[in-house]
A protein has these predicted regions:
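Conserved ATP-binding module of the ATP-grasp superfamily
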Residues: 1-19, 50-57, 75-80, 240
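Short, well-ordered beta-strand elements within core beta-sheets of diverse protein domains
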Residues: 16, 59, 119, 205-214
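A short, glycine/Asx- and small/polar-enriched loop/turn
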Residues: 94-100, 200-204
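Beta-strand scaffold of nucleotide-dependent catalytic cores
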Residues: 13-15, 22-44, 48-51, 77, ...
Length: 286
């Protein structure tokens, strides 16, 4: 079995099963002082064959009554690993017996996440705070020793598919872009491959959707609708052909009827704006 980078795995790590829910504590350290930059809580679903797959990651203001315990545990992990400078991404399972470490990496979280969206929710990004730690260590604590708080709420939804097939169209781009909290997304994996895999893990998710709103209720209403579409109307997100025997054709989109792609000029511009929004792009950017 190979890694996600195509390199052979030569070892195995066994971990005990931790029953609970998973959270993330992202930090930036400077001279051994740790500053929380953002907190996340993962949601997961169970597939028909019993696999646990990521459903989404929500940016949260705190972890409720276990906040202090989890943050103290995360800081203790950083101290034990001697992470005294720069970014760290710590994943923790909150169990009935207390926090359990899943992983801690001396890195920022989510290189593919929209930094613009994160900045709108926090007023900064973990990468920006990291630069401050390296470039201005003497003034870092004075500048960042303030309570962690959100300006807006955010949730990154990892779409899931129970079907596998060649991709005919992605009506979900236009549909989801119309939701109040949807600010962007990433469909590039499906667009490049021309197919949708049956989702069994994070890497077989067909797309990511980025949601952000001042009202947390609106955020949850929109993601609830997306989950309903995944379960009851996947064809409204991805139109697929079940004939997988034809194999992958890199120019699959050229074989589709024109009426699936070409529209009158007066309709084309709004459609383009919708697609740019859904993909997190703006006019003139490739």
């Amino acid at each position: 079995m190979n890694t996600i980078f195509g390199e052979p795995n030569t070892s195995v790590i066994a971990q005990e099963f931790a029953d609970g829910y998973e959270v993330v504590v992202n930090t930036v350290s400077c001279k051994g002082w740790h500053r929380v930059t953002d907190l996340w809580r993962y949601s997961k679903t169970i597939t028909a064959d019993g696999r646990s797959v990521y459903d989404g990651a929500e940016l949260v203001p705190d972890f409720g009554e276990v906040t202090d315990e989890v943050l103290g545990y995360a800081f203790a992990v950083l101290d034990a690993l001697k992470i005294t400078i720069g970014a760290a991404h710590t994943e923790i399972m909150v169990t009935a017996d207390g926090p359990v470490l899943i992983e801690c990496g001396a890195r920022a979280m989510g290189g593919s996440f929209s930094q613009t969206l994160l900045r709108s929710c926090l007023g900064y990004t973990q990468l920006e705070v990291s630069l401050d730690a390296y470039l201005s260590p003497d003034t870092f604590r004075a500048r960042w020793d303030r309570p962690y708080a959100l300006l807006r709420y955010a949730l990154f939804k990892f779409l899931a598919s129970t079907r596998k097939g060649m991709l005919d169209a992605i009506p979900g781009v236009t549909l989801l872009a119309g939701l109040p909290s949807v600010k962007g997304g990433n469909f590039l994996g499906s667009l490049e491959s021309g197919e949708v895999e049956r989702t069994v893990d994070l890497f077989t998710s067909p797309a990511d959707i980025y949601l952000c709103h001042e009202d947390r209720r609106v955020l949850h209403e929109d993601v609830s609708l997306i989950r309903d579409l995944e379960k009851e109307a996947q064809n409204l997100l991805f139109e697929m052909s079940p004939d997988h025997a034809q194999g992958h054709n890199p120019e699959w989109y050229l074989e589709l009827p024109d009426d699936l792609w070409l529209k009158p000029e007066e309709v084309g511009k709004p459609d383009a704006d919708t697609i740019w929004k859904a993909l997190g792009l703006r006019e003139g950017v490739e």
